[in-house]
Amino acid sequence: MAERGVERGGDRGDFGRGFGGRGGGRGGPRGRGRRAGRAPEEEKWVPVTKLGRLVKEGKITKIEQIYLHSLPVKEYQIIDLLVGPSLKDEVMKIMPVQKQTRAGQRTRFKAFIVVGDSNGHVGLGVKCSKEVATAIRGAIILAKLSVVPIRRGYWGNKIGKPHTVPCKVTGKCGSVTVRMVPAPRGSGIVAARVPKKVLQFAGIDDVFTSSRGSTKTLGNFVKATFDCLQKTYGFLTPEFWKETRFSKSPYQEHTDFLLIPPGVKISEVVVDKSVE
């Protein structure tokens, strides 16, 4: 019996194979079949909207061209291409929410995500899902789709780059009201933790803020701050009083390209026309 025990697991003080004998030791390749050791493949983006096709083909190179003509963005890959790797995201809060059903309480997770490039573009996404990872992934996509331009200005003399909000602005959501006041250069962002992070992502360096209402409700606090930043482009100041020269919409400018069905190469269309 003693010899058999030695064969199986060595001496009594040693560790035998136990239940982990199949894996080939710690740190070895795990899993079996097709999925073991395969690198994740990147999905190739196939645009389904006119705007997506124009962006992928390089007809639109700046995100300001989209804002100028108020074109709706339906694909988050458009923002990824135009803004690029400078776009950062941060989870502001993940909170459980419940719904009463016949079977009992159904719990889901709500994620608040802020994205921005710290250069005048910021977005907010809110998503509810059964799993935390799914909620975060969905909120990031919604935040990218809601990216808006933020107008920046000066406190006094127009020296250097814009560093603060152009004027006093107020945003509201629920009972929460956020007010922003221009600040002199070097003042920094005088704000609570939640709006401070949003303002950093928007690229504002100096601002005074005040808030009132139930700021403990983080969701409304973030939305009020985002609403405040959106309103920076909601009015005309003297520098915008000049006569506007209207330009063609990208859809009008690139009509010939958009008439070609997606998936058909331009060279094939040219050959067909020459045959006719």
From Swiss-Prot:
Residues 16-28 have a biased composition (Gly residues). NCBIfam families: uS5_euk_arch. It comes from Arabidopsis thaliana. Belongs to the universal ribosomal protein uS5 family. Residues 1-15 have a biased composition (Basic and acidic residues). It comes from the Eukaryota. This is Small ribosomal subunit protein uS5w. Residues 87-150 form the S5 DRBM domain. Residues 1-42 are annotated as: Disordered. PANTHER family: RIBOSOMAL S SUBUNIT, SMALL RIBOSOMAL SUBUNIT PROTEIN US5W-RELATED. GO terms for cellular component: cytosol; cytosolic small ribosomal subunit; plasmodesma. One of its GO terms (biological process) is translation. One of its GO terms (molecular function) is structural constituent of ribosome. Keywords: Ribonucleoprotein, Ribosomal protein. Disulfide bonds: none annotated.
